[in-house]
Amino acid sequence: MFKQPGHLTSRKYDLGPWTNVFNLCFLASEAAVGCNKS
């Protein structure tokens, strides 16, 4: 039971950079679609 909170926080920190990359890719794709439409 005590392992879960630590595991979740460590997992969250591990995914931090990946979520940033995902957000950048999403914004880039949105910008690309916007440019293509216009």
Swiss-Prot record:
Q: What else is known?
A: Completely overlaps RPS27A.
Q: What is this protein called?
A: Putative uncharacterized protein YKL156C-A
